[in-house]
Amino acid sequence: MKKGIHPEYVKCQVKCTCGHEFEILSTKESLRVEVCDKCHPFYTGQERNIDRGGKVDKFKKKYGLA
């Protein structure tokens, strides 16, 4: 590697919305993430139902057709 052209790696503090914090090496000093291995359904085995509906469902609900 050429010297002086690569960014420095520093310890990066990663914070998840669930409250879990951990450190990695990165070019940034801090990161915020929405999901991590402590709260993601694949790793926890718990299922979360996030059904927001499509455009047709929103239209039907808006005009009372549902």
Curated annotation (Swiss-Prot):
Q: Report which gene this protein is encoded by.
A: rpmE
Q: Which InterPro entries match?
A: Ribosomal_bL28/bL31-like_sf, Ribosomal_bL31, Ribosomal_bL31_A, Ribosomal_bL31_sf
> Cofactor note from UniProt?
Binds 1 zinc ion per subunit.
Q: Which cofactors are required for activity?
A: Zn(2+)
Which family is it part of?
Belongs to the bacterial ribosomal protein bL31 family. Type A subfamily.
Quaternary structure note: Part of the 50S ribosomal subunit.
UniProt organism field: Nautilia profundicola (strain ATCC BAA-1463 / DSM 18972 / AmH)
GO MF, one annotated term: metal ion binding
General function of this protein: Binds the 23S rRNA.
Q: Which UniProt keywords apply?
A: Metal-binding, Ribonucleoprotein, Ribosomal protein, RNA-binding, rRNA-binding, Zinc
One Pfam family name from the record?
Ribosomal_L31
In terms of superkingdom, the source organism counts as Bacteria
Q: Where does it sit, as one GO cellular component term? A: ribonucleoprotein complex
Record GO biological process: translation
Gene3D superfamilies linked: Ribosomal protein L31 (4.10.830.30)
| Residues given in the record as Zn(2+) binding sites | C16, C18, C36, C39
Q: What's the protein here called?
A: Large ribosomal subunit protein bL31
